[in-house]
Amino acid sequence: MPYYALFYEAVDDFIARRGEFRDEHLRLAREAHARGELVLAGALADPADGALLIFQGENPAAAEAFARRDPYVKNGLITTWKVRSWTVVVGNETRARSAESA
């Protein structure tokens, strides 16, 4: 199944401002993970100026919907976001595909 990377660019004072929105953001992330949509997610560090979230699905709709619902986006902590298709060439997913084609 295809992967999609959701890239976030954050405001300079993101860490200082995220507190009141963090619980809701994490709730949305955990729900997406429980549905099998969100595979990995986390903030970028040094500097903490963005985040990367990896989704899996037939199309980018789940990643796009997550961004539109995310309180970080809705409250201006994320200045820009974009979703890109991600081709995995090394990892568990590639082993599974190799086994299926054998």
Residue ranges, per PLM feature:
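Conserved, structured core segments of small domains
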Residues: 1-102
